[in-house]
């Protein structure tokens, strides 16, 4: 997904390229991070439907990747732009540009989606609704939370396409 990125260069420069999952763990001790994520998870645990907004986008995405089984079966709605992975047919990623602390840790964050017979060109903004499952994603050789789409609607780009991690 991060075409042209060189992990060795990133290590030398002290930067990382982030995509899919926001990761704020480097800003906490491990016990403080676990405590903070557990506290945040309680806000969503009892809900069957989760509206992901500009304000909670990074928080919810980080929680979905940390605790995917707690989100399986939940209905999720959010807005983002389309990225078509050229190596995997049937999946589209829906991303937002996100900033955790500063521009050096910015990236694209979101979920792989499937289930819509509609296809959209890269960078098309859409509002999606679907149900979370966890499946093995061959391209990344790992299990990922996947949004099985029930609704997709093309929308305009938000005034500010960026989302921010707020504590």
Listing of model-derived features with the role each one plays in the protein:
Residues 1-167:
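OB-fold and OB-like single-stranded nucleic-acid-recognition modules
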């Amino acid at each position: 997904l991060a075409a042209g990125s060189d992990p060795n260069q990133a290590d030398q420069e002290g930067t990382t390229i982030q995509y899919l999952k926001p990761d704020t763990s480097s800003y906490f001790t491990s016990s403080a991070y676990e405590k903070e994520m557990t506290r945040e998870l309680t806000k969503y645990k009892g809900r069957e439907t989760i509206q992901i907004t500009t304000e909670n986008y990074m928080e919810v995405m980080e929680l979905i990747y940390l605790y995917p089984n707690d989100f399986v079966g939940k209905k999720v709605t959010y807005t983002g732009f389309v990225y078509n992975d050229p190596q995997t047919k049937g999946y589209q990623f829906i991303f937002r540009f996100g900033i955790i602390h500063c521009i050096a840790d910015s990236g694209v964050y979101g979920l792989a989606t499937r289930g819509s017979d509609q296809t959209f060109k890269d960078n098309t903004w859409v509002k999606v609704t679907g149900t979370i499952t966890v499946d093995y994603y061959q391209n990344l050789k790992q299990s990922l939370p996947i949004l099985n789409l029930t609704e997709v609607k093309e929308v305009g780009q938000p005034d500010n396409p960026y989302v921010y991690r707020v504590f």
